[in-house]
Amino acid sequence: MKLTLYAVGSKMPAWVSQGFAEYSRRFPRDLSFNLVEIPAGKRGKNADISRILAKEGELLLAAIPKGNRIVTLEVEGQSWTTPKLAKQLEQWQLDGRDVALLVGGPEGLAPACIKASEQKWSLSALTLPHPMVRILIAESLYRAWSVNTNHPYHRE
């Protein structure tokens, strides 16, 4: 199974790329974790945000291979503890489909992405910086995998 994080925005600081790479390389071959960056629409003083959001959503959905389970990252989504996320990861693996995790831009995700979503996941009720979210998702999923495989990374 493949886990892929589809994220709006492509000009991240080096520490973001390094942090994401550190966790993604730890996953085993049979559970790869990758990042696909979607360019953010140009925002300015008089930008049409709804049009930009729709275009970003269009690009996100076009990048996802058919048959993937779509999981959107949203404040209103389900909040999972590490054990619950581990169970969720296990269910995804049993399902056999690849998983596409979607993170929107500054204004969030387009309505089309939310509509296409099979599950909604909330990392926190807090508003988090998008660069940080990439690393948090990678670490959380790696930790969930370590729980499922009794790897010593996670300690109770």
Curated annotation (Swiss-Prot):
Gene Ontology MF terms in the entry: rRNA (pseudouridine-N3-)-methyltransferase activity
InterPro entries membership: Alpha/beta_knot_MTases (IPR029028), RlmH-like (IPR003742), tRNA_m1G_MTases_N (IPR029026)
Subcellular location field: Cytoplasm
Gene3D superfamilies, A to Z: 3.40.1280.10
Enzyme class name: transferase
Binding site for S-adenosyl-L-methionine: L73, G104, L123, S124, A125, L126, T127, L128
Source organism, top-level taxon: Bacteria
Cellular component GO terms held in the UniProt record: cytoplasm
EC number: 2.1.1.177
Keywords: Cytoplasm, Methyltransferase, rRNA processing, S-adenosyl-L-methionine, Transferase
A Pfam cross-reference name: SPOUT_MTase
Reactions the enzyme catalyzes: pseudouridine(1915) in 23S rRNA + S-adenosyl-L-methionine = N(3)-methylpseudouridine(1915) in 23S rRNA + S-adenosyl-L-homocysteine + H(+)
Chief location category: cytoplasm
Known partners and oligomeric status: Homodimer.
Entry function: Specifically methylates the pseudouridine at position 1915 (m3Psi1915) in 23S rRNA.
HAMAP family: 23SrRNA_methyltr_H
Family: Belongs to the RNA methyltransferase RlmH family.
Protein name: Ribosomal RNA large subunit methyltransferase H
GN (gene name): rlmH
